[in-house]
């Protein structure tokens, strides 16, 4: 169930940047059409909201910064979603300092527009991936490093922070595709509901 306290979201222009998690690739299940969580999120909003999803599969954070940040600014959003870092880890290109620099640059730039920014830590992919214990441990440590950066920046800039790492959906295999990395069509619905219910709302009665 989505709890929105009877209010409506106040935003009018929403833009999402990121990788395949936000683009919305994965398996279609239970007759639920495969859509990005972004599409489901907008459908949950009571008010009319224009939106653009610039996320693209396979990109590391540096590429998201170089290819999508300017597009996001041009859209003139009042709400931005930034979820990045999974490919840095999964493609073996993890660099703590480069990741922090790229994320900080994007958040600093977006913050100057006055837009609200929502950011999410990365889920623990290692619970499903068929890797050795040693490789899983390395990946998990890198994911935790990324999440430390995300949480630190979230606190510093007072961002809307969504906690995927500790949410129960991570351990629900019915919500994930056969590649063990991407949500399936049902999973994207749940992701949208989690993000929607995590955001503050405007009380329409006031």
Pin down the residues of each PLM region:
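Short, Lys/Arg-enriched, disordered terminal segments
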Residues: 1-13, 105, 200-206
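Serine-esterase "nucleophile elbow" of acetyl-processing enzymes
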Residues: 3-57, 67-76
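Gly/Ser/Thr-rich beta-alpha loop segments that engage phosphate groups in nucleotides
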Residues: 20, 26, 60, 87, ...
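Cell-envelope and extracellular/periplasmic
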Residues: 55-59, 84-85
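Short loop/turn segments at beta->alpha junctions
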Residues: 60-61, 95
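Alpha-helical cap/lid subdomain in secreted, periplasmic
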Residues: 66-206
């Amino acid at each position: 169930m989505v709890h929105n306290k009877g209010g409506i979201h106040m935003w009018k222009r929403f833009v999402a940047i990121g990788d395949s998690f936000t683009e919305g690739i994965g398996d279609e299940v239970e007759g639920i059409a495969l859509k990005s969580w972004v599409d489901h999120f907008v459908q949950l909003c009571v008010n009319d909201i224009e939106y653009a999803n610039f996320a693209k599969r396979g990109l590391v954070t540096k590429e998201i910064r170089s290819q999508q940040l300017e597009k996001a600014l041009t859209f003139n959003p009042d709400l931005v979603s930034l979820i990045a870092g999974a490919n840095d880890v999964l493609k073996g290109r993890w660099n703590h300092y480069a990741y922090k620099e790229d994320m900080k640059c994007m958040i600093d730039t977006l913050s100057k527009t006055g837009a609200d920014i929502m950011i999410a830590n990365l889920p623990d992919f290692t619970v499903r991936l068929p890797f050795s214990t040693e490789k899983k441990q390395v990946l998990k440590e890198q994911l935790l490093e990324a999440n430390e950066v995300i949480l630190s920046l979230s606190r510093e800039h007072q961002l809307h922070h969504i906690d995927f790492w500790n949410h129960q959906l991570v351990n629900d295999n019915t919500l994930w595709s056969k590649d063990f990395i991407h949500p399936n069509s049902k999973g994207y619905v749940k992701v949208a509901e989690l993000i929607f219910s995590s955001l503050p709302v405007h009380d329409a009665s006031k």
